[in-house]
Amino acid sequence: MKMKSNFKLWPVGQGLFYSGTIKYENNQNFNFVYDCGSSSMNIDEIVDHYVETSLIDKTLDMLVISHFDEDHISGIPKLLTEVKKIKKIFIPYENGIENYLLFLAFIYGNDGNINEKIDEIILVNSTGPENENNRDFEELNTSIEIEDNFSLPNIKVGVFKGSSIKYRNLWKFKFYNTYLRKTNFSSKIKEEIINLIKDSGCKGLKELLKKLNSPVKNDENCDKEISVKNSLKKIYEKYCSSSYGNSKQNQSSLCLY
């Protein structure tokens, strides 16, 4: 099978935006992005240019997020706006669904929306035992138990235990998790989301994300009300907004080869 590949490191300044296209028979493409962010304000223009020039049908097969510092993910809300579909998003795994919740807090706290845009969010645990029969991109077997109050309609969430996947025997992608240091902050993210759901009078995450502009008390000692959207943004900023080494949750990184 004939194949042609094209890769590009986009000029975003401080941050990272890397894209790739693998072209094969009958003009079919496999498109992927590794990180999409910058400290520069022009990231949205660059994302626009990428979608217009590289995604003919506005479908992205794979988005890989290395970590959650803002200069690596600031362009994702814009990317979600411009594409029709992102089939799979891979994020680093660290002790449960906390990084999944942190990802949602960032997206919805920054005017993003994943409704009907994403098929699957996969947390990658490359330190797990390798399953040789579970490597095909289109048929990955992932599993994780998510409480009903954290699930979202039509979006599958799973954990991939392994270090490599392949796409139609054309290309092999290898993942590697790096851990800077262990923290106990991850469990607090889940706790804060639970409290926000409760304080907003909602029954679960699905309902909460439909009330982004509704007011919620900032805390029990504060009479000032802020919106659900701003509360989610504050949760993200509390745990992972810094790109200078002092973020609390950004102690793991997902490398892609």
Regions found by a protein language model. Give the residues of each.
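Flexible, acidic/histidine-containing loops and adjacent segments that form or flank the divalent-metal
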Residues: K2-S5, E82-Y257
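Conserved beta-strand hairpin/beta-sheet module of binuclear metal-dependent hydrolase folds
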Residues: K2-T53, K58, L256-Y257
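Generic hydrophobic/packing signal
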Residues: W10-F17, C36, K78, V83, ...
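Active-site environment of divalent metal-dependent phosphoester hydrolases
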Residues: Q14, S40, F68-I73, N95-E98
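Generic alpha-helical propensity signal that fires on short helical segments
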Residues: E25, Y50-E52, K78, L102-G109
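Active-site metal-binding motif and surrounding structural segment of the metallo-beta-lactamase
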Residues: F30, I43-I91
